Amino acid sequence: MTATALEIAQALLRCPSVTPADAGALGVLEALLQDAGFATHRVTFSEPGTADIDNLYARIGDGAPHLCFAGHTDVVPPGEETAWSHGAFAGDVEGGLLYGRGAVDMKGGIACAVAATLDYLAANGGQPQQSGKGSISFLITGDEEDVAVNGTVKLLQWAAERGERFDHCIVGEPSNVEAIGDTIKIGRRGSQSGVLIVDGRQGHVAYPHRASNPIPDIATLITALNDEPLDQGSAQFQPSNLEFTSVDVGNPATNVIPAQARAKFNIRFNDHHTQETLRALVEQRLAAACGNRIRARIEWLPSNADVFVTKPGGFTDLVSAAIADITGRSPDLNTGGGTSDARFIAKYCPVVEFGLVGQTMHQIDERTPVSDLDKLTAIYRGVLERYFR
């Protein structure tokens, strides 16, 4: 009998893998997958100024079609552990609920994918298809919750250099809003941050004619950049949104006009834009608002968060059908929320995100119903059966 999702999830939760630590989590998965016949690879990536990160790639089968399950075993810190009703890394079950940091995001989802795969292989002669064709892989990182530079993005590059080719991918992020089966994430908005800088001239408040106050000017520019929408949205995406998050002058004095004002902002953008065209549009609007009077510029911050979407069709229909079989629900195909590692995978193959319900992720007493683990495992099993039919 293969391991259950609950057993695998508990083993993972008992590894305190607060990013960037692994704490044995990848070893739990590697042992299970090796026993099932997967070829496994542990790959460590480095980057100056960041922690070395261990990653896991495992594959069984040969050729196409190739379905990949992707995810991360690192978790955010638990916060004040005395505030938890159960140990953050105990993996306790009470009242039908599994408690622990990562239960939802996303050790529970990984556990369901592994359990479903092991059960499917056991029923199919140990191969994705009894004909011997087809491949299943797991692409698991320990670097998603922090800087995300030594994880999925580099593991994908490593796999491509080895000749790995993915046809489709499921990321087990907690996609559902209220109940298992209500939402599939088929894309994510891009993210671009920047700093608006307005230069003035420092001076004494009693002699404003000898100074140039940048504060009214930056207020004018903030209003101008906020007033006109960037777009009206698209078929799969809500309108792009520019949001200012802070305004700073670094001036503790009450009698000095500051020399400079800075405002930080972030833009979540849809598929009407690329990072390049978005920057050009904002710069154009800034120049128009400045005219010949205001001296301002934008410092754009580095970003690897491009917009992506997997168009509704064959693969999303397949996953939706597997969901409907188990839950009776027709999932919403959604592109809301923040960024995820799916943005890297989208450059290699169509990708969707479907996992547990995300209501308690990153919270004290993060938890998931054990029944949801069972449902998600059954859905993943249904995906495998349809995919390799």
Swiss-Prot record:
User: GO: which molecular function terms?
Assistant: acetylornithine deacetylase activity; cobalt ion binding; succinyl-diaminopimelate desuccinylase activity; zinc ion binding
User: Which species does the entry assign this protein to?
Assistant: Rhodopseudomonas palustris (strain HaA2)
The protein's required cofactor(s) are namely: Zn(2+); Co(2+)
* Pathway(s) per entry: Amino-acid biosynthesis; L-lysine biosynthesis via DAP pathway; LL-2,6-diaminopimelate from (S)-tetrahydrodipicolinate (succinylase route): step 3/3
Record carries keyword RNA-binding: no
Q: Which domain of life is it from?
A: Bacteria
Signal sequence range: none
Kindly state the subunit structure of this protein: Homodimer.
Q: What class of enzyme is it?
A: hydrolase
The entry's free-text remark on the cofactor is: Binds 2 Zn(2+) or Co(2+) ions per subunit.
Q: What is the lineage of its organism?
A: Bacteria, Pseudomonadati, Pseudomonadota, Alphaproteobacteria, Hyphomicrobiales
In which residues is Zn(2+) 2 bound?
Answer: 105, 145, 362
User: So what does this one do?
Assistant: Catalyzes the hydrolysis of N-succinyl-L,L-diaminopimelic acid (SDAP), forming succinate and LL-2,6-diaminopimelate (DAP), an intermediate involved in the bacterial biosynthesis of lysine and meso-diaminopimelic acid, an essential component of bacterial cell walls.
Report which reactions are catalysed by this protein.
Answer: N-succinyl-(2S,6S)-2,6-diaminopimelate + H2O = (2S,6S)-2,6-diaminopimelate + succinate
What gene name is listed for this protein? dapE
Q: Can you tell me which residues form the catalytic site?
A: 74, 144
| Matching InterPro entries | Bact_exopeptidase_dim_dom (IPR036264), DapE_proteobac (IPR005941), Peptidase_M20 (IPR002933), Peptidase_M20_dimer (IPR011650), Peptidase_M20A (IPR050072)
Name of the protein in question? Succinyl-diaminopimelate desuccinylase
Q: Which family does it belong to?
A: Belongs to the peptidase M20A family. DapE subfamily.
